[in-house]
Amino acid sequence: MYSPFSDPPIVTIEKSSYSVNYGNTVTLTCTVTSTPLHTSVYWRKIQGGQRVNVDMTSSKYSGSTVNTPSLTISNTDNNDETFYVCYASNIIGTGQSSQTYLDVVGGKINLFFFSNF
């Protein structure tokens, strides 16, 4: 049954970028406004030029649920530094946020030594 008050979710991210020190935890804040209520939330990140789903089965990530749509990333490393997008779906459709960039500050430096000997 159609209702003029039914739309895909409106998904917003609090900031256009976040910064975290290497090894620390960061939460990318996502809010969802939805009528009818949203039934799922998921995140994607840019990896190799493609949007890929964030692997929520990994203990590195938490959140990304209907009740807690924000994404928390633990033990951040250089692989986490990229763009992220939050998505939410209801029976009408899927909405997505604008992208946010996570900057991981510091981290491991790979040193290579070359010898002419």
Language-model features: where?
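Proline-centered linker/hinge motifs at extracellular inter-domain junctions
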Residues: S6-V11, K15-S16, P36, G106-I109
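Extracellular Ig-like/FN3 beta-sandwich strand-entry sites
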Residues: T25, H38, N79-F83
